[in-house]
Amino acid sequence: MPKSTNSVASKARRKRILKKAKGYWGSRGNVLTVVKHAVDKAEQYAYRDRRVKKRNFRSLWIMRINAAARQNGVSYSRLMDAIHKKNIEIDRKALAEIAVKDPAAFSLIVKTALD
């Protein structure tokens, strides 16, 4: 009996992997064995960096809040402590947005928290 191969599925699988490597330079974009490694590594980086992105944004918000807080004469840690003690329900993302877009409102929040 002749050897039976499922060439339709094989070709589809290769095509799917090669499609993920679109735009890669040199053999990383067209040699299947190299493409597999390149795509695997790219997916590992993507997985890792989806988590790192969350950390980076939180860090950015904290930096912005700290800069605005220091302009109002208080450090970030003392401001956040005061906000938590006064039970002011505002997250860092919103607080950073207010600090950048509306400094007057941020100053009011600082004054409310510290009184």
UniProtKB/Swiss-Prot annotation:
Cysteine disulfide links: none
GO cellular component: ribonucleoprotein complex; ribosome
Gene3D superfamilies referenced in this protein's UniProt entry, alphabetically: 6.10.160.10, Ribosomal protein L20
Taxonomic superkingdom: Bacteria
A biological-process GO annotation: ribosomal large subunit assembly
Record's keyword annotation contains Metal-binding: no
Membrane-crossing segments per the record: none
Record keyword Repeat present: no
Recorded family membership: Belongs to the bacterial ribosomal protein bL20 family.
Protein name (database record): Large ribosomal subunit protein bL20
